Curated annotation (Swiss-Prot):
InterPro entries: Ribosomal_bS16, Ribosomal_bS16_CS, Ribosomal_bS16_dom_sf
GO cellular component, one term: cytoplasm
Protein name: Small ribosomal subunit protein bS16
Domain of life: Bacteria
Alphabetically ordered keywords of this record: Ribonucleoprotein, Ribosomal protein
A Pfam short name: Ribosomal_S16
Lineage: Bacteria, Pseudomonadati, Pseudomonadota, Gammaproteobacteria, Enterobacterales
Record's keyword annotation contains Ribosomal protein: yes
Length: 82
């Protein structure tokens, strides 16, 4: 099953997440189909905390992809800010 979820990157104690479309059987940071955004939970100042390609996310959901709980919350946050 195709899912849209977060893949953790960044350094120890400084997480940075890529929002990726992947097969649910792949490892958390493993192979992915497409990168559709990023989330920086510790962004400060002028740093961009969240960027999502909502058109591509809607495309994948239309193809049957499921959303993780956190990604679903981030999409709602992005739509509210837009």
């Amino acid at each position: 099953m195709v899912t849209i979820r977060l893949a953790r990157h960044g350094a120890k104690k400084r997480p940075f997440y890529q929002v990726v479309v992947t097969d649910s059987r792949n490892a958390r940071n493993g192979r992915f189909i497409e990168r559709v955004g990023f989330f920086n939970p510790i962004a400060s100042g002028q740093a961009e905390a969240l960027r999502l390609d909502l058109d591509r996310i809607e495309h994948w959901v239309g193809q049957g992809a499921t959303l993780s709980d956190r990604v679903n919350a981030l999409i709602k946050q992005a739509k509210k800010a837009a």
